[in-house]
Amino acid sequence: MISSGWMQEMEPIPEEGTEADGSEWGAMSDTAKRTMRKKEVYTSEQINTLVSTVPKEAVPQEWLVENQVVDPEMATSYLTESLAGPTSARGSSYSYSYESHYDNPPEEEYEHFTNDDGVHQMQKVTRVTKVTTTRSVRQVPVQSPYSNIDFDSSGLPTPSPVIDRDPSLEMMARMGGASDHDSEDRSAPPPAPASRFLHEDSGIPSAPGVPDVVDAGIGEVTVVWSAPLQSNGGEVRGYQIEMREFPDGEWESMGVDHLLKDTTCRVTNLTSHEVQFRVSAYGRTGFGPASNPSLPVKIPISETDLATSAGAPLAPGRPTVIAVDGQGVLLEWTPPVADVHSSPPQGYQVEYRVYGSRDWIVANEQLVQENVFTVESLRPNGVYEFRVRGKNQDGLGHPSMSSGGVAIRPAAPQRHVPARKVSESVQPPGQPQMVEVGDDVVKLEWAPSVQNARYIVEYREVGDPEWHTANYDPIVQNGIQVEGLHRNSTYEFCVISIVDNIASQPSETSDIIHLRPTCNTSALRPAPNILEAPEFLEVDGDKITICWLPAQSQLPVMGYDVEFRDLQQDDRWYKVNDQPVFACKMTVGDLIMDHDYQFRVLAHNASGCSQPSPPSDFVHIEPSTNRFSSDTMESPHLGHHDVVKYVEAERFGAVPLLQEEMVRESPPLPERDDSPPPLRRANNNVQWRDPSLKEVIEYLSSADKDKQLNASGYLQHLTYTDNQIKEETREYGGIPKLIALLRSDTPRIQKNACACLKNLSFGKENDANKLAVMEADGVRLIAEVLRTTHDASVKEEAAAALWNLSSADMLKPVILESATEILSQQVIAPVLAVGTSDPTRHFGSTLFKNSTGVLRNVSAASQQARRRLRDIPNLIEALVHFLTHAIQKSQVDSPTVENAVCLLRNLSYRIQEVVDPNYDPAAAHSSSSKNMKHVASPKPEKKKKDKEKKKDKNPKNIVTGPSVLWQPHVVKLYLKLLQDSSNIETLEASAGAIQNLAACQFPPSAEVRAAVRVEKGLPVLVELIRLPEDFVVCAVATALRNLAIDPRNRELIGKYALRDFLDKLPEPGSPRRSAISDQTIGAVLGILFEIVRSSAAYTKDVHELKGTDKLRALSRSYPTYSHRVCKYASQVLYVMWQHKELHDGFKRSGLKEADFYSGTARRGDSSTLARPISSQGRERPSMHQLDETLSSGGGYGTMESNNRAGTLRPASATSQTIQRRYDQVPRDGPVYSSVQKPSPRGGGGGGNIDDSWV
């Protein structure tokens, strides 16, 4: 039986041919063709084969894939039944070379054409006469990791999924001169494509960067560009530059005869007045797309057209990116070379642009004096390029070369190291010393502290105040290799000793280490000495345990590699383990019966790898258990079968195999343990071992319920906190099998399956698992388990799995449809039926916590989700009842309270849509602005409130449903949580709920503003402004901003809290305080805007408290602060100047009218600052676009993990939105609103108490 993998069709040997004019070597008439003459042409192809010695009649029918192509990347590893008789399989790769000799020189023509994808490429046609061809074949071992052949436990090859032949995947026959490259034998077949039907390895590079003209002379210019971002499977071999007359001339190639090797070109003999340039890159298989055109360039044609700044600096060195974070880069460059015709630069101008665009943007307002600069406020995940220009008294100099495309990657999330007690009694280790340094890696060693100590290594970039942890799990070796560092940067390191979970003080900081290309610091630190040959500890059937003596090394040994060979297959050595092992023992399994093996060992330290040890004696693998044959250890007869096999080579008949070879790796057992546990022996001499992950997943589909129960329980243990196991479980098909177990009638199996799905879907990094659960209909089946089971523990695990799944935005609609009503009716709503009994046990249950977590996540999904949850009977009443009970019991810091408050806050978002489904925020704002004075004044409402108070005396008039959200007693609950809770997530959500309720222009919002004042909530909120957590301060400040719409609230805030708000503004000339975000500053400016424009007295107080100086400095602080913050500060200054009675005081302070204006800010520009604010905060789904009034950086969907519960808890939402204007309808409606409700109870009343601050 023969199956071919990656078999490529041969290109036909060139035939004889003549030109149309009858001449054998006629001249070419087509100008698009290029003629060359060669003496020899080589073509080669490679074929991979798989040969099995199993008789064809004994092979299962599904294995017969003779006429189909097998994709080696899609090889599976399921078990197959053992076949009778000896079985073997061997894989080989053959390289066929053809050498052609010509009596007359060949003629080669290059034709340019455009393929189906629109890509411009070049095709070569060769015509020769009297060809003599010699073919040679050479067998090469299959070594590519993309073409591994899998075998089952009996040594049989497992079939791979079959795909149709794709002509685009056929190997191109290479024709050219007899160069070393073309005649080189390939040792492995080409890598398999990344997907079955898409061949990404096209060899055609992407478009280069937009070209720039950096220098110009009379009739000539210098053009530079950036290399392509993707080479798509091959190096860029050159560039072609094209030019056209601006604006609509034809593009003309300027490099027909040769490719440009560098990314710069001097173009001469130009006669056009104004031109544009573009560049395309040439890869392995042709030209890629052209870049975008450059900016139009005027060509100097005389001395008068040249630039007059002759003394300007020369171009600085190409800027290098030495650090990248989520929104900025740190650049470094070298100064321009000294020139007698120009003075040195007085400073530098840094410019940047989006990669692929033409316009350069100036990044710095003031000239940079140093050779480093940080460009900030860049778009995360954007690609930019940078350049630098010097400037002196003679003008702006030539620009530097572009840095090339730089991707602005978000900073990697940092994992928090568990807090450990620090004690002076633990001796710190010695100063870490560099052993080896590379581009992005450093190897360190240090003197150990005490005998049983473990070590944590920390590092930081020079200038970074924060230390980062290199290894979160303490290591026992006194050496480490730190990887993934920023290239061309500088670092320092320190080490901490850990003894019995008690940490020492950090060691002395290492010397500063510069990351440079790899170099050894000392030749006196060699690799480990060669080990002695390994010995056999135990042989049992197809498993063998080997051991060896520890290596002798001057540096700590960092692990061992074990290699094996099987002489029945070939004499090459192959690795057993994927990762180095630390123990001096290993059990190797799945060996082939009646084969003879040898083993050898290599040791690693920080300096490198030792030479392989001498090979072990041969060991013969026999079926009998625990037999160790000394005969087979000495000189076993290998039993080669000298039977010549044949492979059918396309069009060339039968070719005998020169050597039969198979690449086969025997992994240790279990597969993922780098020091596998030995076989275990019971008293009755029964032996066993732990199953591998594949075996565990196979057991899930067993018909034996005991195996299902044990396998699902063990898989739950394996998937806990191990992301790689979670990924492999998905890849091995474990998720559909777990979901199938949800239909089991055994509660313990259902519980284990739910727990596994909970672990697999924990964490943002496992979103692929969540999607796999949804695609396998897992959400509906988990919800069905919740509906039908009576087992409380099963319900807890099912709700926990849904909580983790609901953190993914794409699953929220599915969970909303399948599970929210079940959770609400069966878990939350029955709270109201508890009656007089103590509900503490129910409220404190894990099921209640998990259920509120699911609803919390789903409530942030969409407008439809909010409406559906609000309409669930008794849901809102149950949540309010729970919060009331928690406050009475002083249990306000629990995760369940956090979930409930966040859920209520999200349901309060745009709550006016409850009574007005067609609610338009812009229209509502416009109409309310016309009646602003009427809405804010309590006097016109007095009669109406008196009537409603009479109505409230009716005991049957009970408020239910969404109207409960804006009742005064609910607002009082939020204020009580703000006073008593120490959970910052609960604080933020409580403030956000008040913010949302006060954000609209209808009567219930006005009554909420009054209720907060009546309940003495204003000083509670102002007190929280002093907290260090910025996202809490932002939510509180925004809530106060909305409450300040009420005139009396605004007066009280201006009288008692003005100094607190001004303290949040940065001092003039001081560096930025990272602890205060632009959103928080924007909210504070919104409060000041309301206070200042309504009162000259408070405006005077702002000025006397140095607020004017802070606002003036803030309005000119771009780009340190965002453009929006600067604009807000300008608007506050503008309304301050509108109080004409204060002009004299301003002028006595040395200020004039121009100091209160910035740019083009006018009254009409205050539309954004005057808007009330509402938000879902950080829980808003990332798929929803933010309103254009939002400041940058307010990300949503941030998740944090609760390791104790093993579930994913989204962080509470920050209320970060922008205020709505009163005097005009904004161009784009904001994304926030509130709810209408007929007069709530007791919110209002006039009296002195209504105006009291405390």
Swiss-Prot record:
Biased composition (Polar residues): 145-157, 1166-1176
Mapped ARM repeat ranges: 733-775, 777-820, 874-922, 969-1012, 1016-1058
Acidic residues bias spans: 12-22
Presence of the UniProt keyword Repeat in the record: yes
UniProt-listed GO biological process terms: cell-cell adhesion; embryonic body morphogenesis; regulation of actin cytoskeleton organization; regulation of protein localization
Record CDD domains: FN3
Tissue specificity annotation: Epidermal cells.
Key words of the record: Cell adhesion, Cell junction, Nucleus, Repeat
Name recorded for this polypeptide: Juxtamembrane domain-associated catenin
Organism (species): Caenorhabditis elegans
Source taxonomy: Eukaryota, Metazoa, Ecdysozoa, Nematoda, Chromadorea
